[in-house]
Curated annotation (Swiss-Prot):
GO cellular component: blood microparticle; haptoglobin-hemoglobin complex; hemoglobin complex
Binding positions for heme b per the UniProt entry: H58, H87
Function: Involved in oxygen transport from the lung to the various peripheral tissues.
Family matches, as InterPro entries: Globin, Globin-like_sf, Globin/Proto, Hemoglobin_a-typ, Hemoglobin_oxygen_transport
Transmembrane segments annotated in the record for this chain: none
Subunit record text: Heterotetramer of two alpha-D chains and two beta chains.
Gene Ontology terms, MF aspect: haptoglobin binding; heme binding; metal ion binding; organic acid binding; oxygen binding; oxygen carrier activity; peroxidase activity
Regions annotated as coiled coil: none
Domain Globin: 1-141
Keywords on record: Heme, Iron, Metal-binding, Oxygen transport, Transport
GO biological process, one term: hydrogen peroxide catabolic process
Protein name: Hemoglobin subunit alpha-D
Reported tissue expression: Red blood cells.
Length: 141
């Protein structure tokens, strides 16, 4: 999955943005709902307006899960097992949505990092988010 340098890069970047992670979670979901409006179908009970408490709270859950995954890169399957089960069996989320969310998170990360969002950071986070999406989608097979 990630080499030692990429792992260090992902963890280092996460430490830099951790203080803004809740805001980033909200921005990621808001962006996903705007760019990929079909993703809204999984949230029929949410107020999907920009700045809603429900988007803010769910965004916190998303970035908290990403933070846990970063802390447990060597054990992603176990770390994300409950989320994988929830999304596959209870919520029945189409796994393509994990990739859409990852794309939106990359954009938000780039906005927050500015020039520190280097090609190396992009590649490292792309590998990380691809691995997370793959683990979340495993239950669908």
């Amino acid at each position: 999955m990630l080499g030692a340098e990429e792992t260090a890069l992902v963890r280092g970047v996460w430490q830099k943005v951790e203080s803004a992670k809740d805001e980033m979670g909200e921005e990621t979901l808001t962006r996903m709902f705007l760019v990929y409006p079909k993703t809204k179908t999984y949230f029929p009970h949410f107020d999907l307006h920009h700045g809603s408490e429900q988007i803010r709270n769910h965004g916190k859950k998303v970035v908290t899960a990403l933070g846990n995954a970063i802390q447990n890169l060597d054990n992603l399957r176990q770390t994300l097992a409950d989320l994988s089960n929830l999304h596959a069996y209870n919520l029945r989320v189409d796994p393509v949505n994990f990739k859409l969310l990852a794309q939106c998170f990359q954009v938000v990360l780039a906005v927050h990092l500015g020039q520190e969002y280097t090609p190396e950071v992009h590649v490292a986070f792309d590998k990380f988010l691809t691995a997370v999406a793959a683990v979340l989608a495993e239950k669908y097979r």
